[in-house]
């Protein structure tokens, strides 16, 4: 059943649910974005809040933290850049006409996705739109980017791919691959029969993995647009994906995580024990951490599938996880950031797998709202 984890600290400064949590590349700071319209910076050294970022006029949907700057996006249709030392707003990016769902910051560009059916590329320093990607017929959610250095060196394709490729997932049931240099659609990835909620990109093989409300994960060649594989064993929406060491982990509304061989689509292992949708995944040093709509985080030995620890304390869905050193950080719709001691998690031998049993679900995960429904907390 797994032992209970102890909370090192509870940070309850936000006055609304936390929608996202980002760790800086140097590991010194955390950034949280909240329903209360603010973001906060936290020190990983002592867990103290070191800056309050105020300025958005509606809730913060997503955030990304770099070493020198923090980036947030909001339902107020804007993106903001902040100084991590002073908390001062350095730039406001305006142009979207509806909720901004996601942002992705690279060395000199910022990409965004929105309910206005577009994705956009911005110059980071000037805050100007450099390209607008139009073609989706509904809300654009997920984003991934393949830099020019990760793409084939082909003189015939240099003009098209010279600025890299952007991959977007939408509630129109498709993903699209865009040429960043021109803004043109390079490929449309058709095959899903439900909204594309999440995607991850394996840049070395030019493969995108997409998760959908149709309960499948699909693998695509982003250069040719070919569908390579379909991963079919989930019984509910696929909400989150994690790719590491040629293994793909998928978290679902069917209350399980599945581990797949990324190159073949073979299901290697199923991680049960959740009492609600699996809302977040994080792999770290041989341990798979999960967050769930049952308000708990869990630590599984990634190789054996054994549940090692359950982290209890939140009262609402866990939206995001990060791990730094020997500390697990969990951000929840209850408004709290919790810090947990993860020392002592040991690898154990793999267990034989039983045949998967199918179950029906009374309702599927529908983006943020379904996973945020309060559920009775029962002993794990």
List where the protein language model places each region.
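WD40/WD-repeat beta-propeller blade N-cap
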Residues: 11-18, 54-60, 93-100, 134-140, ...
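WD40-repeat beta-propellers
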Residues: 39-42, 63, 79-83, 119-122, ...
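Residue-level detector of Asp-centered blade-edge/turn motifs that repeat once per structural unit
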Residues: 25-26, 65-67, 105-107, 147-152, ...
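Conserved strand-to-loop turn within each blade of WD40 beta-propeller repeats
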Residues: 33-36, 73-76, 113-116, 169-172, ...
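Short loop/turn segments that connect beta-strands within beta-propeller blades
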Residues: 44-46, 84-87, 124-127, 180-183, ...
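Terminal intrinsically disordered, low-complexity extensions flanking WD-repeat/beta-propeller proteins
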Residues: 303-310, 315-380
């Amino acid at each position: 059943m797994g032992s209970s984890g102890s909370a090192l600290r509870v940070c309850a400064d936000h006055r609304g649910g936390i929608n996202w949590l980002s760790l800086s590349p140097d590991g010194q700071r955390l950034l949280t974005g909240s329903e209360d319209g603010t973001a906060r910076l936290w020190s990983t050294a002592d867990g103290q809040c070191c800056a309050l970022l105020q300025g958005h006029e509606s809730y913060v949907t997503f955030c990304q933290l770099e070493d020198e700057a923090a980036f947030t996006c909001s339902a107020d249709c804007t993106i903001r850049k902040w100084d991590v030392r002073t908390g001062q707003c350095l730039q406001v990016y305006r142009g979207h006409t509806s909720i901004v769902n996601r942002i992705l910051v690279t060395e000199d560009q910022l990409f965004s996705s929105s309910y206005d059916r577009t994705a956009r590329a911005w110059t980071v320093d000037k805050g100007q739109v450099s390209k607008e990607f139009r073609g989706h017929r509904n809300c654009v959610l997920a984003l991934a980017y393949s830099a020019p250095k990760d793409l084939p060196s082909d003189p015939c394709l240099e003009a098209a791919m010279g600025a890299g490729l952007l991959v977007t997932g939408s509630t129109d049931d498709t993903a699209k691959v865009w040429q960043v240099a021109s803004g043109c659609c390079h490929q449309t990835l058709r095959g899903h029969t439900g909204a594309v909620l999440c995607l991850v990109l394996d840049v070395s093989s030019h493969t995108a993995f997409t998760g959908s409300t149709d309960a499948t994960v699909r693998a695509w060649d982003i250069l040719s647009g070919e569908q390579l594989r379909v991963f079919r064993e989930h019984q509910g929406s696929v909400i989150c994906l994690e790719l590491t060491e040629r293994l793909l982990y998928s978290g679902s509304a069917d209350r399980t995580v599945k581990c797949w061989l990324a190159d073949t689509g073979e299901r290697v292992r199923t991680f049960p024990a959740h009492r609600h949708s699996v809302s977040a995944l994080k792999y770290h040093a041989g341990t798979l951490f999960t967050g769930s709509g049952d308000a708990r985080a869990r630590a599984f030995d990634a190789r054996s599938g054994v549940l090692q620890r359950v982290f209890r304390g939140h009262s609402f869905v866990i939206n995001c996880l990060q791990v730094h050193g020997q500390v697990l950080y969990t951000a929840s719709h209850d408004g709290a950031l919790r810090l947990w001691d993860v020392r002592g998690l040991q690898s154990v031998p793999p267990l034989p797998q039983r045949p998967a049993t199918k179950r029906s679900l009374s309702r599927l995960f529908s983006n943020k709202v379904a996973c945020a429904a309060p559920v009775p907390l029962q002993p794990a």
